[in-house]
From Swiss-Prot:
GO terms for biological process: translation. This protein binds to 23S rRNA in the presence of protein L20. GO terms for cellular component: cytoplasm; ribonucleoprotein complex; ribosome. The gene is rplU. Part of the 50S ribosomal subunit. Contacts protein L20. This is Large ribosomal subunit protein bL21. NCBIfam families: L21. Belongs to the bacterial ribosomal protein bL21 family.
């Protein structure tokens, strides 16, 4: 059994005991989180969401992804700019699919 959830502007296919990485969620490690924006579960397609359906998980880790380097250069002048960015993420282990 699997479900398709919507979180952080993305749609993810999840199954029980699967680990997923999502955009930063403001909760502490070890806390339980419930996703209620379920697009598909157990053969039911939502319009846009399936009613009385939820996916529960436990937050395993809060962290930052690897750094990406952004380099901007204007070839007609001496202007150049180098920036780094590290995206925040939350690691969630799915424990229950209900619906």
């Amino acid at each position: 059994m699997f479900a398709i959830i919507k979180t952080g502007g993305r749609q993810l296919k999840v199954e029980k005991d699967q680990t997923i990485f999502v955009e930063k969620i403001d909760k502490n490690e070890g806390e339980t989180i419930t996703f209620t924006d379920i697009l598909f579960i157990n053969g039911k397609i939502g319009t846009p969401y399936v009613e009385n359906a939820s996916v529960t998980g436990i937050i395993e880790k809060q962290g930052k992804a690897k750094k990406i380097v952004v380099y901007r250069h204007n070839p007609k002048s001496t202007h150049k700019r180098k920036l780094g960015h590290r995206q925040l993420f939350t690691k969630v282990k799915i424990t229950e699919l209900k619906g």
